[in-house]
Amino acid sequence: AAGAGVLLAAGLVGAASAVGAGDSEEAPAPTAVPAHTLTGYWHNFDNGSTVLKLGEVSSQYDIIAVSFASSTATPGQIDFELDPVLGYGSEQEFRDEIAAKQAEGVAVVLSVGGAEDHVTVNDEASANAFAESALGLIDEFGFDGIDIDLEHGINATYMSRAMEAVHAGVGDDLVYTMAPQTLDMQNTTSEYFQLALNTKDFLTAVHTQYYNSGSMLGCDGQVYSAGTVDFLTALACIQLEGGLDASQVGLGVPATPNAAGSGYVDPQVVNDALDCLARGTNCGSFVPDQTYPGLRGAMTWSVNWDAHAGNAWSDTVGPHVDGLP
């Protein structure tokens, strides 16, 4: 279906709503991923952690975000090239590894952005360019969808239109995630939160990065510091009470202390936060007014840092996510 979506390019954004509406009538809700997921970012680069081929990623992960697509000279357009340092003999070898992971029930998405890259979607032309190029890459490599990790500002109106067009091209099997920073999700008026709400009908999960962050307000109006169970639970509560479904909210954390500048928590603290939100147990000082048994799960930066530490993070958090209600 992705290939057909590229043919819509000239009228991608304009056609998105109409096509998407037809899709939703014919197809059930997305079932491309389990009810609770462990998500990890995979490095298409060597940063001194561990170089991994995709096939070497721990089987605990349900969603793997390939990091990263890059911008081109055309505003909004994205591209992807394998880093030679990974040692792939061919692009086909990488495509075969994606297919093998998918055969195991794992979704592989292409992440757009990161701290180093600037992808700008702020008008109809750039929204069209984003959607057309994203659909092309999904078709070329066999990705299940797109992860939005834009860290230099977004325009919710046009990014929403771009993702609606991607959804129209792929259909309801699209896996669509995002990883905003904490400041991006403090309230529903922020552009990132608006993007999530605008596209909630086909949004798989928001994995806010609860690290590399200063202190932030929780949903109770109190100030919480990063690196604590309360930071995870009280901030996730903002999204849970702000219009997203529990199945669309996940906790993003570093896999090891080296994986982030600040905000690392022990994997058992991640499990406690999941329990607090899903079951009302193992909370810190913040206790949510209700439980959210449908909570999506957890995300980590990154599968490579996790592997560098013997997969201790995924071996601890993965089974716990699987055991959520």
Regions found by a protein language model. Give the residues of each.
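N-terminal export and membrane-targeting signals
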Residues: A1-G5
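Generic secondary-structure transition motif, activating predominantly at the C-termini of alpha-helices
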Residues: S58, A278, V321-P325
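A recurrent domain-boundary module in secreted/ectodomain proteins
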Residues: V6-G14, M299, N304-P325
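C-terminal region of N-terminal signal peptides and the immediate post-cleavage residues
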Residues: A10-A32
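Chitinase-like catalytic core of GlcNAc-active glycosidases
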Residues: A27-G250, A255-D272, D289-L295, W305-T316
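Active-site-adjacent alpha-helix of alpha/beta-hydrolase-fold enzymes
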Residues: N271-R279
